A protein has these predicted regions:
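Terminal accessory carbohydrate-recognition/targeting modules of carbohydrate-active enzymes
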Residues: 1-168
Length: 168
């Protein structure tokens, strides 16, 4: 089973309910520059990890071509999809809620993580986006580079912009 959210321009976010990119058209953020078929896979997937009291747990899910896999679904306690997809994970006394939304009429996606730490231990969340910036169905170009622009912090949230090959 998969979720699908759209932006009204032909862009979308669609992965399995566990957050894996299992099909060729899966992407966390697929932008559309010209409807209906000029789509670019901007962010393939997210790798998510929480460190609690010095021990790290990957709670993202993905199976790779070489047979290796991330089994974050083992920590997934709930997935719901009313207006937006929401995931809840429980890891050693820490609850993590993730919600993704797309802005209508724009090639923009936002994701929010809420970490409720019920332990007295230090917890640190790390998220690694797997950027592609490639046409839908195409591989990343050899030598492709990315440039990161920092934005100021807004209401306690970090923001920024990534650019590659004229796409941003």
């Amino acid at each position: 089973n998969c979720y699908l959210i759209t932006n009204g321009l032909g862009g979308y976010s669609s992965l399995t309910m566990t957050g894996a990119a299992a099909r060729g058209d899966h992407a966390f953020f697929m932008a559309c520059t010209e409807a209906p078929n000029h789509r670019y896979n901007m962010i393939q997937r997210l790798e998510e990890q929480i460190t609690v009291n010095g021990k790290s747990y990957i709670f993202s899910t993905q199976e790779y071509a070489d047979g290796s896999r991330q089994e974050g679904y083992r920590y997934l306690s709930e997935f719901s999809f009313e207006d937006t997809p929401v995931w809840r994970f429980h890891i050693n006394g820490v609850e993590i809620e993730k919600e993704a939304v797309m802005r209508q009429g724009e090639n923009t996606i936002a994701v929010c993580w809420r970490v409720m730490n019920r332990t007295r231990s230090y917890a640190c969340l790390a998220v690694t986006p797997y950027f592609r910036f490639a046409e839908k169905g195409q591989d990343i170009c050899a030598g492709q580079t990315y440039k990161r622009y920092e934005a100021e912090e807004c209401s306690g949230y970090s923001a920024g912009r990534i650019e590659s090959g004229g796409l941003s």
